[in-house]
From Swiss-Prot:
Its main location: nucleus. Residues 312-358 form the G-patch domain. One of its GO terms (cellular component) is nucleus. This is Zinc finger CCCH-type with G patch domain-containing protein. A zinc finger (C3H1-type) spans 155-178. Residues 252-283, 455-513 are annotated as: Disordered. Transcription repressor. Residues 455-467, 496-513 have a biased composition (Basic and acidic residues). PANTHER family: ZINC FINGER CCCH-TYPE WITH G PATCH DOMAIN-CONTAINING PROTEIN (PTHR46297:SF1). It holds the Pfam family G-patch.
Length: 513
């Protein structure tokens, strides 16, 4: 049939190129014959095809059935093998997860704003099998969060004791969150050395929830930190927390510091010795700056380290300063040592340690019961009381100065009253004092009289200068009267002393021969 079609094609090409009319007639007749022959050949082929079609259809059905049976056999074998592999994989996972029960980890928790990781404790393995994000079978772990920030994360205390009457869906507290095992991360322990001012932290409040806040100051000696809590619902926003009640949060600065430390380590390995020394200098400066900052935000102790050196030359502090110590920071290379000096204690002589402990327990466990400083302060208090008693005794003694002040000087006395008081002075009382004491008192009173006269002259000048101001004139008149009274008293006292001195001189002349 293909040969006939090829011949027909050749005849058609020759017919197009033929120029003679007789030749064209012959080619047309040949073309018609070939077309009829092709038509007959096609009809014969269709009849033969219809006769063989049922037999070929049966062969195809059989072949299709065999193919389906082979595919089903292969699928059955593959599914059984896959099931065995999955069961083996799940068994290995359960064995691995069962060994992790009781360990600490970091587990995800779905919040309204997204997923956040919190420290948790693995308490069991769930029986249900889940498919993780990569399409691999995985088991779920039941975890209890150690730092719950929301009520749905707070573990049920009755569930932990096995006495909760509600199931997981009805209880208001958590019976353990179910998380895929593949999402578990490494436990993030709290690093209290990172505590510094403005550091974000989680703080434990009485409601057993951890609330967010920021550090105000840190006391590494007492391990106490003052935190300002976020939010307006806290009556006392600033509170003191112990270190075990805090969880420092990681910031971007910490990640940058870690990256910079890694880069500095790699650069120190690659660079020359000169660059390594410069890096070490930078690290030393950063360390000193860190220690200074640490000293600024540390609770100030009651006593300064080295306060006893005010009685010495302070050679100890000078040596420590040369060795790199920064005043105000703790001892040690990182400045996190003690700040308060260690108090010396003296135990009773000839007593055993058990007897000393009994004495301390009898004093309600006072740690400073045998402290040397406490004994010194007690001795100082006794000495202070003795000094006060001596002062009272000395103040009760009457000397010439006290006698003159009490007897002669007095507020509101006029010149005439001063004269009367001076006349009433007993001669025997003045005779009790020595001539030297009387001379000193005479000089002192003379100075007081001259000073008082100068004050009166100044007040008189003020009166003359401010004659038009009535109120000021009144105040100046009062001052003038007061100065006159004091001057009269001093003059009376001076006359009394002069009289006593003159009497003594007269007696001395009487005894001279």
């Amino acid at each position: 049939m293909e040969e006939y079609e090829a011949q027909l094609l050749v005849v058609e090409q020759a017919l197009e190129n033929a120029a003679d009319e007789a030749q064209r007639q012959d080619l047309l007749a040949l073309k018609n014959n070939l077309q009829e022959l092709l038509a007959l050949t096609r009809d014969t082929g269709d009849e033969a095809h219809t006769d063989e079609l049922p037999q070929q259809g049966d062969d195809l059905d059989d072949e299709l059935q065999r193919l389906k049976s082979e595919l089903s056999d292969l699928e059955a074998v593959g599914s059984s093998q896959t099931a065995l592999d999955e069961e083996r994989q799940l068994a290995d996972l359960r064995t691995k997860y069962t060994a992790m029960v009781g360990e600490k980890c970091s587990a995800p928790h779905e919040h309204s704003w997204g997923t956040c990781y919190h420290n948790a404790l693995i308490c069991g393995v769930d029986d249900e099998v889940v498919m993780n994000s990569e399409g691999v079978l995985d088991a779920r772990l039941r975890v209890l969060f150690t730092n719950p920030t929301h009520r749905e994360m707070l573990p049920c205390s009755y569930y932990l004791e096995g006495e909760c009457r509600f199931d997981e869906t009805k209880c208001r507290f958590s019976h353990g969150a179910l998380v895929p095992g593949s999402s578990i991360r490494k436990y993030n322990p709290p690093d209290f050395h990172k505590l510094s001012r403005s550091r974000p932290v989680f703080a434990l409040l009485p409601d057993r929830l951890w609330h967010r806040g920021r550090v105000l100051c840190v006391n590494f000696v007492e391990q106490v930190c003052r935190v300002r809590l976020d939010g307006q619902d806290h009556k006392e926003r600033e509170r003191d927390f112990k270190f075990e009640e805090l969880f420092p949060l990681t910031t971007d600065q910490d990640e940058d510091d870690e990256l910079s430390s890694e880069e500095s380590n790699s650069s120190m390995n690659d660079d020359s010795s000169d660059e390594a020394e410069s890096d070490m200098d930078d690290l030393e400066e950063a360390r000193r700056a860190r220690m200074v900052e640490l000293s600024l935000f540390t609770f100030k102790p009651t006593e300064r380290l080295g306060a006893w050196e005010e009685f010495t030359r302070g050679i100890g502090s000078k040596l420590m300063e040369k060795m790199g110590y920064i005043h105000g920071t703790g001892l040690g290379s990182d400045g996190r040592g003690i700040v308060t000096p260690v108090s010396a204690q003296i135990l009773p002589q000839g007593r055993s340690l058990d007897a000393c402990m009994e004495l301390r327990e009898a004093a309600n466990g006072d740690k400073d019961y045998f402290s040397v400083e406490r004994k010194l302060k007690r001795a100082q208090r006794r000495q202070r009381k003795a000094d006060e008693k001596a002062y009272v005794r000395e103040s009760q003694r009457v000397d010439v100065f006290t006698f003159l002040n009490d007897s002669v000087l007095g507020p509101g006395e006029s010149s005439q009253q001063g004269e009367q008081v001076a006349k009433k002075i007993k001669t025997n009382e003045l005779q009790q004092h020595s001539t030297k004491t009387l001379n000193v008192e005479t000089v002192r009173i003379a100075d007081e009289i001259r000073r008082k006269q100068r004050d009166m002259a100044k007040v008189k000048q003020s009166l003359d200068r401010n004659s038009g101001d009535a109120q000021l004139q009144k105040r100046l008149q009062v001052q003038m009267e007061s100065h006159k009274q004091e001057l009269a008293t001093l003059q009376a006292q001076e006359r009394s002393l002069s009289k006593e001195q003159q009497t003594r001189k007269s007696k001395n002349k009487m005894f001279e021969f």
